[in-house]
Amino acid sequence: MLAAAEELSAGGVTLIQYRDKLGSPRHILEQAKELRRMLGRSVRLIMNDRADLCLAAGFNGVHVGQDDLPPARVRRVIGDALWLGVSTHNPEQLKLADQTNAEYLAIGPVFATSSKDRPDPVVGLEGVRRARQLTGKPLVAIGGITRANARSVVEAGAAAVAVISDLLPSPRKSAEEFFRILG
């Protein structure tokens, strides 16, 4: 994971979300601190789910899902200086998340994904378009994003894309290709 993050940074990536659903809090914190040390301040680091570990590791923000702490509680923990992102999977969730003080909202899965054990229903490009109509906040599209479909997702209204599987096995090369495709 650390080597991949270093390659992503070398490929021009400026924001990485650290997501570890299986590791113990101690392991996650150790990895997160090493990630921060290794990348310095050249890359914004977002902690998945855990506001406490975000603060302890010196990350730039927290991303929460629908089953995590409510955004208002997370904001009380992290303060106003750090970023807060919220995952949404349908128009109702997006409308509620839009009323929070999150800096950005994620919408997805846009396409079928293998990165989650039990993913929510696919929203498709139409889901991204609808989300764009419902919020003025930056939208991050997630779920099944590849170099082949990233441009269409941005054209549908996403400000950014979140990618896991299509960055491997060559993170630097893949990141550079994403930047070339997205301009």
Predicted regions and their residues:
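Glycine/threonine-rich flexible loop motifs
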Residues: S115-D117
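Flexible, gly/ser-rich surface segments that form the specificity/activation loops bordering the active-site cleft
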Residues: G108
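Conserved N-terminal beta1-alpha1 strand-loop-helix module at the mouth
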Residues: M1-P71, R75-Y104, D120-E126, R130-L139, ...
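A short, flexible beta-alpha/helix-coil linker loop
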Residues: F111-T113
